[in-house]
Amino acid sequence: ADQQAVFDYCVANISKKPSKFADDTVIGSQFNQPLLEFSGSCAGCAETSYARLITQLFGEKMYISNATGCSSIWGGTASISPYTVNKDSGHGPAWCNSLFEDNAEHGLGLYLGQKTVRENLIKRIAEIAGSDKASAELKAAFDEFMATKNNTKANDAPAKALIAELEKAAAAGCTESAEILKSKEFIAKKSVWIFGGDGWAYDIGFGGLDHVLASGEDVNVMVFDTEMYSNTGGQASKASNIGEVCQFAAAGKEISKKSLSEIAMTYGYIYVAQIALGANMNQAVKAIAEAEAYPGPSLIIGYAPCELHGVKGGMTNCQNEMKKAVEAGYWNLFTFNPANKAQGKNPFTLTSKAVDGEKYQALLANETRYSRLTRAFPERAKQLFARNEQVANDRYEHLSRLVELYK
C-alpha cells in the first residue's frame, strides 16, 4: 500500500526534464515521459521495450499504423489503450490498426493524407505571409518554420510560434488565418510509424511493405522480429531460423532465415537498421533517431525474444538474451544510412563481431525452441544447428565485405 502511494504520486507529479540531455541518447530519452504504459503484454515482452522508446523520442508527434498481431493486441485491446498523452501538452500518439494484412499500405495512406493537408495549409499560409498586410512577426515566423519544415524535432517550436502569429492575425480580423487554424494540428511535421511483427513483414504483408518502402515516401517501419508468428501460437515464418522447432516445423525448420534487411538495402535509398536493445542501447537509440530524421523510407528490425522461445530462467532474462544473441553472432547489428554518401561517409556501419561458435551453440541450447529438437531428434539437431551456425558465419562474412564495398 505504501509503494502504491509513492507510485501514484510519481505518475501524477513527476514531470519530464527537457533539455537536460539530447533526446537521441540513452540517458536523454529516458528523461522523456513514455507514452506507452501498462500495455498488458506478456511479462518481459521485448516488443513493448522498442515501442515505448519510440514514444519517448517522438510520441507527441506520432501517427502509428499497426499490423494485426501481438503488437495490435497489447497496443489496442478493446475498451482501453496503453498509448497515452503527455501530461504537459495533452498530445500523444494517434494509433490505428487495419485487421486485414495491408498495414504498410494503411500506414502510407496515413502519411499521404496528412502530408496533403499540410502542404495545402503551408501554401495558404505562404499567401498570407506574402501579403502586404502580414506583420513582420508573422513573416519571420513563417520563414523560420519553412527552414525546419522537414525536420520533426526542429519544426516543433517554429510551428508553435507560427500558430501563435496566425492566432494574432485571426484576432485582428484575418478570416483566412481563422480558417487555417481550424486544422492547426496538421501544421507541425509529424512522425509516421508502421509497426508490425515478422509474420506480417517477412510473410503475409511483404508485398505491401516492399511497395511502401519503394515509394520513397518519408515513413518509418518498425519490425518486431520474434522469428515466428507469436500471436497465433508460434508458427514458422520466413524469419524463423534453421533448426527452430515451432508449428509447421515440428522437426526443426530446414531452410535459413530470410534477410529482409538486405532486400531493403538493395534499393539504395532506404534507411535500414538491425538493432537489439538489450545488446547495445546506444546503437538502438541512434538508429531509431537517424531513421526518423532520414528524409525517406526507413526500416528498423529489432530482435525480440518471445515467451514462446522458452528462454531458460523466463522472460526476466529477455534483454540479456538479446545481448547473448549479439555476442554469439546469432543477431547482427548494423545500419545503412544513404544520407552518409553525400557527406563522403560509408553508408554501411557494422557494429557486431564475428560468430563465436561456443557461445552460438550455448545460445541455441538456452532456448526451448531449439533444445527440444535435441531431445527429440539428437542427430538431426546436431546437423541443423551446425548449418545454422555456418549460415551465420557466411552472413557475417558477407556483411563484412559490404563494409568494404560501400567505402
Listing of model-derived features with the role each one plays in the protein:
Residues 39-79, 196-211:
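Conserved phosphate/anionic-ligand binding catalytic regions in large, soluble enzymes, centered on
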Residues 1-14, 68, 72-100, 309, ...:
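Terminal amphipathic helices with adjacent charged low-complexity linkers/tails
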Residues 1-56, 63, 80, 93, ...:
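Flanking helices and flexible, charged tails adjoining ferredoxin-like Fe-S electron-transfer domains
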Residues 4-5, 14, 74-75, 84, ...:
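Thiamine diphosphate
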Residues 100-176:
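N-terminal leader/propeptide and maturation segments of large enzyme subunits in energy/redox metabolism
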Residues 48, 53, 57, 61, ...:
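Generic, well-ordered alpha-helical scaffold segments in large soluble proteins
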Residues 26-40, 97-112, 116-133, 186-188, ...:
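Conserved thiamine diphosphate
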Residues 79-93, 284-380, 387, 400-401:
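Glycine/aspartate-rich loop-and-adjacent alpha/beta segment that forms the canonical ThDP
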